[in-house]
Amino acid sequence: MRMEVVLVVFLMFIGTINCERLIFNGRPLLHRVTKEETVMLYHELEVAASADEVWSVEGSPELGLHLPDLLPAGIFAKFEITGDGGEGSILDMTFPPGQFPHHYREKFVFFDHKNRYKLVEQIDGDFFDLGVTYYMDTIRVVATGPDSCVIKSTTEYHVKPEFAKIVKPLIDTVPLAIMSEAIAKVVLENKHKSSE
């Protein structure tokens, strides 16, 4: 009898018995499923250039190496890149005081040059301190005509439910818009120079 009581108390402690009805209901402590909220954000920018012209900048390993020169002055307090700018390269970015996020690191995970898309994963930084467990940007260049395309950018992130209300106002499409506009500017300037 004593052993059964110890066993029931132990099972109640690790959560394998519903205490109210004493019904076995699995092993939640051992097989815990944490629910996370998945959020998708979208940005699109139409560009008066061919998809191949835009992808030649967006998909280039040179892009990561020259990022501070392409973006508005003062956007980074510190910028370092590990790698050659291609798959596996890591961008370590620190922003000026007073900005949030103040710091994060991104990794170029995948480039598909045939279909003109890439995956860029945020691997650590301030958002992860606020309950974000996954953060991935997908950038696609989609042809809409022989001399026009759309840069379609998506941010997908997962956040613990208790942090969702805090994080939602902090993550937006502004970084995607800034990057797309910088890419379009370079492409259109190059196109203009070549037509002179």
UniProtKB/Swiss-Prot annotation:
**Signal sequence residues:** 1-19
Q: Which cysteines are joined by disulfide bonds?
A: none
> Any idea of its EC number?
3.5.99.14
Q: Which reaction does it catalyse?
A: (4-hydroxyphenyl)acetaldehyde + dopamine = (S)-norcoclaurine + H2O
Q: Which GO terms describe its biological process?
A: abscisic acid-activated signaling pathway; alkaloid metabolic process; defense response
Enumerate the InterPro entries for this protein: Bet_v_I/MLP, Plant_def-hormone_signal, START-like_dom_sf
UniProt KW Transmembrane keyword: no
Q: Where does (4-hydroxyphenyl)acetaldehyde bind?
A: 137
Q: Where is it found, in Gene Ontology cellular component terms?
A: cytoplasm; nucleus
Membrane-crossing residues? none
Q: Characterize the regulation of its activity.
A: Not inhibited by O-phenanthroline or EDTA.
Q: Does the keyword Ligase apply?
A: no
Keywords from the UniProt entry? Alkaloid metabolism, Hydrolase, Signal
Q: Name one GO molecular function term.
A: (S)-norcoclaurine synthase activity
Chain positions recorded as dopamine binding sites: 104-106
Q: Which PANTHER family match?
A: BET V I_MAJOR LATEX PROTEIN DOMAIN-CONTAINING PROTEIN, OS08G0374000 PROTEIN-RELATED
Q: What function does the entry list? A: Involved in the biosynthesis of the common precursor of all benzylisoquinoline alkaloids such as morphine, sanguinarine, codeine or berberine. Condenses dopamine and pyruvic acid or 4-hydroxyphenylpyruvate.
Record-stated family: Belongs to the BetVI family.
Q: What name goes with this protein? A: S-norcoclaurine synthase 2
Q: Give the organism, scientific name.
A: Coptis japonica (Japanese goldthread)
Q: What is the lineage of its organism?
A: Eukaryota, Viridiplantae, Streptophyta, Embryophyta, Tracheophyta
This chain is encoded by the gene named PR10A
